[in-house]
């Protein structure tokens, strides 16, 4: 994709790096929308039509090979991110799923470093990551996601991908989806884009889920055929941590009767606990609300070890076979040590109504309640706001008011 004439204007976001001794110090970052959300069109004289749709390789007439594809497909900048449902205000990032004019941008964005030319690389093994969230406008079926992906620091900037991270190129995750461009290059052979993925937060106001997803490849891997499938190189299900799945139903939800009351903002703390050799052993999630630490729930299910953290024993017992086979918690830690990119998004699910997240064993939502046609009746303008993104030493990113 060749960058076009339209200017790209990245919203600025203040984030924090924390130590026990020095507290949290502000840092400057910028936000970039995924490259495939940018307007992509054919070069002048090549007629109307785009350069391919999600799930498919690019069209052969404009993209017979990588070189022609780079010349024939122009990616424009985005001068006004608010038109895509993305706005920042100091330390806050707001993502709107639906705009007042009815458009549904469903944005996915990444965190750039202060140069805007590279992604901010997070190395979280042995550290913790914390943010504040307002999830009040996220009914059943919505998914506000904040997660890490083992993308290339420059968005794999290259001769035929001159835009790179500046334009949001290089996305990959453990689902190994086929997209018309991978690492900014025409995906002529229709391969899948795979990499390690750490889902810190996938949630709405009714249910919430943490899940490491391992792959047995480093960085972005182009899969083909069986490699892209369920038994392939990445763990598609992840090792999920959701209170409802272990019979704890009073922990998280809308109202005072829940320990975490999603009708008010709250703080989400995720610790990546390592052993002395620096290997990831456990992932520990808890919350802070109204100045009080809300400890993690403990599992309450037969056949599942009594625990308040994700570890190999828990993953094994909950049937996360692919996770265990493809590297398990130590493998996830190796990716977190190498460095991962922060992605944040908001979306709904036309096909499955997000029922894996909040229905049946996973939550209180009724069958079909999360259908997009129902969501808009309940909440015409679903959105999420993430504030005060901060990371650093264990115990440094949150405090309890005495």
UniProtKB/Swiss-Prot annotation:
Glycosylation sites: 89, 247
Chain segments annotated as coiled-coil in the UniProt record: none
Keywords, comma-separated and alphabetical: Carbohydrate metabolism, Cellulose degradation, Disulfide bond, Glycoprotein, Glycosidase, Hydrolase, Polysaccharide degradation, Pyrrolidone carboxylic acid, Secreted
Active site feature: 197, 202
EC number(s) per entry: 3.2.1.4
Keyword Cell wall biogenesis/degradation: no
Gene Ontology, cellular component aspect: extracellular region
Cell compartments where the protein resides: Secreted
The organism's place on the tree of life at top rank: Eukaryota
Residues bearing the modification Pyrrolidone carboxylic acid: 1
Main location group: secreted
UniProt cross-references to CDD domains, sorted A to Z: GH7_CBH_EG (cd07999)
UniProt KW Secreted keyword: yes
Listed GO biological process terms: cellulose catabolic process
GO MF annotation terms: cellulase activity
Disulfide bonds: 18-24, 51-73, 63-69, 140-365, 172-195, 176-194, 215-234, 223-228, 239-315
Entries under InterPro entries matching the protein: ConA-like_dom_sf, Glyco_hydro_7, Glyco_hydro_7_sf
Reaction(s) catalysed by this chain's protein: Endohydrolysis of (1->4)-beta-D-glucosidic linkages in cellulose, lichenin and cereal beta-D-glucans
Family in the record: Belongs to the glycosyl hydrolase 7 (cellulase C) family.
Record's function text: The biological conversion of cellulose to glucose generally requires three types of hydrolytic enzymes: (1) Endoglucanases which cut internal beta-1,4-glucosidic bonds; (2) Exocellobiohydrolases that cut the disaccharide cellobiose from the non-reducing end of the cellulose polymer chain; (3) Beta-1,4-glucosidases which hydrolyze the cellobiose and other short cello-oligosaccharides to glucose.
Subunit comment: Monomer.
Stated name of the protein: Endoglucanase 1
Organism: Humicola insolens
Gene that this sequence comes from: CEL7B
């Amino acid at each position: 994709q060749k960058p076009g004439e339209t200017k790209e204007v990245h919203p600025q976001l203040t984030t924090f790096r924390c130590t026990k001794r020095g507290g949290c110090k502000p840092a400057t970052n910028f936000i970039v929308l995924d490259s495939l959300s940018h307007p992509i069109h054919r070069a002048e004289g090549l007629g109307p039509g785009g350069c391919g749709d999600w799930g498919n390789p690019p069209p052969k007439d404009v993209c017979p090979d990588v070189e022609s594809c780079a010349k024939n497909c122009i990616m424009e900048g985005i001068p006004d991110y608010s038109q895509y449902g993305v706005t920042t205000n100091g330390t806050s990032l707001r993502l709107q799923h639906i705009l007042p004019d009815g458009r549904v941008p469903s944005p996915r964005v990444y965190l750039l470093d202060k140069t805007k030319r590279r992604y901010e690389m997070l190395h979280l093994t042995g550290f913790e990551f914390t943010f504040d969230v307002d999830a009040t406008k996220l009914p059943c079926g919505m998914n506000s996601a904040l997660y890490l992906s083992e993308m290339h620091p420059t968005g794999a900037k290259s001769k035929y991908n001159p835009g790179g991270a500046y334009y949001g190129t290089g996305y990959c995750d453990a689902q190994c989806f086929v997209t018309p461009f991978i690492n900014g290059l025409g995906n002529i052979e229709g391969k899948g884009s795979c990499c390690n993925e750490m889902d810190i937060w996938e949630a709405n106001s009714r249910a919430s889920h943490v899940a490491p997803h391992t792959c047995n490849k480093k960085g972005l891997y182009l899969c083909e055929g069986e490699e892209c499938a369920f038994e392939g190189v990445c763990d598609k299900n992840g090792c999920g941590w959701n209170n409802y799945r272990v019979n704890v139903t009073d922990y998280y939800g809308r109202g005072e009767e829940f320990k975490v009351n999603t009708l008010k903002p709250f703080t989400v703390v995720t610790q990546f606990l390592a052993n002395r050799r620096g290997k990831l052993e456990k992932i520990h999630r808890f919350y802070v609300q109204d100045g009080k630490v809300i400890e993690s729930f403990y599992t309450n299910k037969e056949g599942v070890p009594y625990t308040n953290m994700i570890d190999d024993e828990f993953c094994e017992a909950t049937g996360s076979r692919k996770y265990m086979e493809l590297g398990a918690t130590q493998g996830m830690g190796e990716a977190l040590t190498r460095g991962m990119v922060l992605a944040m998004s908001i979306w709904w699910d036309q096909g499955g109504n997000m029922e894996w997240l909040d229905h049946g064993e996973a939550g209180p939502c009724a069958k079909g309640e999360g259908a997009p046609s129902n969501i808009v009746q309940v909440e015409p303008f679903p959105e999420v706001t993430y504030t005060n993104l901060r990371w650093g030493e264990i115990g440094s990113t949150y405090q309890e008011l005495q």
